[in-house]
Amino acid sequence: MKKIILLLLLAINVKSFAQKFEGLASTPPMGWNSWNTFQTNISEELVKGIADSMVSSGMKDVGYTYLVLDDGWMAMERDATTGDLIPDPKKFPHGMKALIDYVHSKGLKFGLYNCAGTKTCAGYPGTRGYEYQDARFYASLGIDYLKFDWCYTDSLNAQEAYGTMSKALFTAKQPIIFSLCEWGSHQPWLWAAKDGQLWRSTGDIGICYQGDTVIGGGWRPNCVMKCVDLNEPLRKYAGPNHWNDPDMLEVGNGMSEAEDRTHFSLWCMMASPLIAGNDIRKMTAVTKAILTNKDAIAINQDVLGVQGWRYASKDSVETWFKPLNNGDWAVCFVNRTRQPQKINFNWKKENVNDELSSKQLNAATATYKIMDVWTKKNLSTTAKAFSATVQPHDVVMLQLIKQ
């Protein structure tokens, strides 16, 4: 009898800790977010235009599903009677529900933003003290994604704050992807898998490849390669339904074509969420080609869900590997220098053994066809050593297809 009671108590306890919807992010989420390009300068017209462009550009067809409206969508004060958040009536004259219905009619999903503190980062009403009320409000709108930031939190405990919001969303019974955006300050990779589907592993990204950049107000963003360096060691914490997030994409926002290609390639290698942040209504053919490269995206979305890693680094040229579900491998050679760099990689002399996934690449016992992910060229097999020149701040990204 005591054993039965103990089992019942354990079952109740486990159920009480179930506080996120499973299966919403079996592969890294893909979509678009308004912040990088528009900050709080958002509107109903903009959102509809972005939704239309996600469809017409082919982004939806290759997997970009979530349209996320970041900071600035709400009025500066809550409803004086109900305490509810109020979508800004000037920015959204037909209301938020009608706009969400429009986005859903395009076959897309919709996300909103708020903050764990008393205010959002831009000074709009935060969620602190309103977690369950806001969760019910989001459920009534039918949103699919919530980005939850970390401004104006004072001495708030991060684990408790995000845990409370996660429980509130779960209680509201609307399946919503919960994106924890506390910048990696409190090591969310150690505790956030029970709360949400992705967590920021870095501070905010900027439009810069590497180095130290200062933006207005003295803000120092993380350049692309700093985000990479911070995120890469955390691979063991990532996997289906719980992803490391080194922040949104800056592809198309001002870096060079080579730097954009490197940025996208490494986000794909690291199984990072692919959340575009450019004005896709006006993107160039080059930007579109990078963001919609089906082979790179397939590497990112591989169902094995293993984050790739930096296998070797010599003279600022890095070699990355990522095991894939069907026995194939993704390989990326990254040139962090400002000069072209020649590489020569003898597959048979390298025994790539990934303890995390228990996958092994041994070209001495198996042969792989080599396909260049960006040029789409077939490049012989691993029976021969691989030679190439990697251009400055660029990559050579390969898929090894097992024979």
Task: Please place each PLM-identified region on the residue numbering.
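Glycan-recognition surfaces
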Residues: 130, 177-279, 300
